[in-house]
Amino acid sequence: MNEHTPQRTARRTRMVRYATTATAAAGLALTALAPTAASAAPRPDSVQQRLDALVKDDGMPAALATVKGRDGRSRTYTAGVGDLATKAKVPVDGQIRAGSNTKAFTAVVVLQLVAEGRIGLDTAVDTYLPGLLRGDGIDGRNITVRQLLQHTSGLPDYLDAPALADFVPIQYRYFEPRELLDGALAQKALFAPGADWMYSNTNYLVAGLLIQKVTGRPYDEEVTKRVIDRIGLRHTYVPAPGETALREPHPHAYLAAEPGVPRFDYTEMDSSMAWSAGAVVSTDTDLNTFYSALLTGRLLPADQLAQMRTTVPAELLGPGVRYGLGIQSRPLTCGGLAWGHGGTSAAHKNRGGVTEDGRAVSITVTTVPDAPTAKHMTDAVDAALCR
């Protein structure tokens, strides 16, 4: 759900808080066996090695990945166990809660509506949702749609509201979007609109309300019609109100725990707390398909895709990271950029990216890791795209 700052993540060890808090620690050194005169020993698979390390060295219950190589072929990977209680295997390409990858889906729908002339990127939010955004330093007449999508609105994050301070008691609780928004509006604005950049889930909560107001249809129906069905994401969906279980084979996922404390199974949850900022369920393969389709123009006209890829510095997400409209770019060690978003739910973390030449990778773990482990995930994405 939240791809945010390290300070906020530290506040919540057992729940989702920003996936993109990441930083620190070093990657794994990969070695290859030298060939002999008689035969060459098989080269260890670097992706599998890194997933194994996320489980063995970093303590993740499970890790899953799908990698699409330079040859256009995809390969899936798993490590760890799918259920800590039964030690069941991790389902290959199992369903996961995609967290803030949802923001890219939401941004696509908004930009499609821009292309249709129904929304103006630089039009005030108040034009479409009059009177909705009012608070201490907050005024929807001064916040544009672009600023929502780019996290430059100054809106505070609703995840910082007291009602969301502990995920355990709200595992099965339904939240109306307005209730979440009220938690944000009770806080002071982070800065004047356009004056700075700060990741805030509230921006995409408002974007979901904007979609509903302009189309007259539920958010989930618009995302399904305009994105999921359009490019054939067969294992991706927006959970219905009250739907708490995942629909297809999946690994169990757990709240992060203090050392010595048993992990709390958070596989089931009411995802209304994330809604248009982080509720999408998907698989690593479907996420690769989505971002590849997005970058190749299958979801947006050229003008809107160019707007989406117009970025501002977002160094809080990592060195060299820049944020566009619902997607971010990250420099690769081998040159070029990886485009995507990544996401964290209460008990999943995903990292990934696609390149201009069609390479793609998505990696997911089944608990929210600390900053060094999150850095290992980012390093694994880089290594997979650069090999």
Across the structure, where does each feature detected by a protein language model lie?
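Secretory targeting and sorting signals
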Residues: 1-40
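Catalytic loop of the DD-peptidase/beta-lactamase superfamily, centered on the K-T-G motif
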Residues: 2-3, 38-78, 262-387
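Hydrophobic (often cysteine-bearing) scaffold residues that line and stabilize catalytic clefts
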Residues: 43, 47, 98, 102, ...
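Residue-level preference for non-acidic, small/hydrophobic
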Residues: 51, 71-72, 103-106, 110, ...
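Short active-site loop at a secondary-structure junction
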Residues: 58-61, 86-146, 191-200, 275
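Solvent-exposed coil/turn segments that connect beta secondary-structure elements
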Residues: 82-84, 153-154
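Short, surface-exposed loop or secondary-structure junction motifs
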Residues: 137-338
